[in-house]
């Protein structure tokens, strides 16, 4: 399953969001011969060591080794974890997601992507669009892309949900060219 992106729910994650992510990520990456597969969920209790009681958040980097083991076991190109818990990293109040290109893994949180988090009415379509943008962003990092200055590019850094809402779920022309060069040259495929 080398040319496969594995999607792993961590804790309870809505199945419609997972399906939306899987279908749209695959529709884009299929041109590189990369498919997407959703596997069974990991219990959030497996990451109790990442929980900060005072912040009521999970330290994102502690999820990555488990995702890396899944990548190895499935011989996958990449693994994308999806969770509903709130994530943070040292020096940051929160993060929407994290990626580790060396491990070939990424993680996104839906927690702050729900419109309800901001006091807005529920909007499933908006939630799914935001989740797709964050997933494509983190996968871009997995495949070697850096942040992009173009605010419409999915690789633009999201400092707030406003930034996420402004950008597209697609890579800009420059980032797409870099991605095509990397995936076309076996940038990721040659890794173990």
Swiss-Prot record:
Binding-site residues, Zn(2+) 2: 148, 153, 172, 175
Function text: Probable zinc metalloprotease whose natural substrate is unknown.
Keywords tagged on the record: Hydrolase, Metal-binding, Metalloprotease, Protease, Zinc
EC number: 3.4.-.-
One Pfam family of this chain: Peptidase_M54
Self-association and partners: Monomer.
Protein name: Archaemetzincin
Catalytic site positions: 138
Gene: amzA
Any GO BP: proteolysis
Obligatory cofactor(s): Zn(2+)
Keyword Nuclease: no
EC category: hydrolase
CDD domains recorded: Peptidase_M54
Binding site for Zn(2+) 1: 137, 141, 147
UniProt organism field: Pyrococcus furiosus (strain ATCC 43587 / DSM 3638 / JCM 8422 / Vc1)
Disulfide bonds listed in the record: none
Presence of the UniProt keyword DNA repair in the record: no
Cofactor note: Binds 2 Zn(2+) ions per subunit. One is catalytic, whereas the other seems to have a structural role.
Any one GO MF annotation of this record: zinc ion binding
Family, per entry: Belongs to the peptidase M54 family.
């Amino acid at each position: 399953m080398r040319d496969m992106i594995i999607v792993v729910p961590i804790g309870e994650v809505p199945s419609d969001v997972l399906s939306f992510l899987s279908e749209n990520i695959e529709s884009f990456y299929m041109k590189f011969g990369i498919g997407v597969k959703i596997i069974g969920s990991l219990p959030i209790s497996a990451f109790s060591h990442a929980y900060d009681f005072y912040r009521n958040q999970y330290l994102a980097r502690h999820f990555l080794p488990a995702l890396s083991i899944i990548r190895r076991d499935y011989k996958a190109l990449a693994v994308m974890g999806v969770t509903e818990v709130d994530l943070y990293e040292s020096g940051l109040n929160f993060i929407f997601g994290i990626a580790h290109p060396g491990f070939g893994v990424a993680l996104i949180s839906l927690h702050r992507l729900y419109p309800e988090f901001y006091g807005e009415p529920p909007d499933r379509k908006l939630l799914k669009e935001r989740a797709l943008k964050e997933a494509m962003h983190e996968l871009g990092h997995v495949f070697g892309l850096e942040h992009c200055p173009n605010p419409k590019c999915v690789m633009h850094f999201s400092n707030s949900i406003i930034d996420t809402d402004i950008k597209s779920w697609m890579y800009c022309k420059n980032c797409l060219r870099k991605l095509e060069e990397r995936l076309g040259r076996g940038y990721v495929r040659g890794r173990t």
